[in-house]
Amino acid sequence: MGSVTPNFTVKELACPCCGACDMDQEFMRKAQVLRDIVGFPLIPVSGYRCRKYNSSLRGAAELSQHPEGKAIDFRVRNLTGARRYLLIRTAFLLGFGGIGIGKKQFHVDGRKGSPVSWGY
């Protein structure tokens, strides 16, 4: 299937429902820069989602950026306070519009307007 960027593959980012992987190129360029700067693995858990699959997920945002190819949920091993800070700071500096952070996961998206962040 190949790579979308040096660190992220089509297989990792494809919709589990239909196999489509229509990720936005500029968004993926920024995701790769984020990975390069932080210097530790960001493992995609969810990337592109077709609208059908996205609407089937409980808790998925109505205006989710996943069907636009502008969102990724990552699993991050050993997500320490220092790593959380580095991820959040770098994502904001790179211009990601939405940033969510959980105990073991990290979300970035390409929404427009004022940046937002949340914990989950």
List each model region and its residues.
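Extracytoplasmic cell-surface/polysaccharide-interacting catalytic and binding patches
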Residues: 1-37, 112-120
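Surface-exposed loop/turn and secondary-structure junction residues enriched for glycine/proline
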Residues: 11-16, 51, 56, 60, ...
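Glycine-rich, flexible loop/turn motifs
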Residues: 4, 53, 63
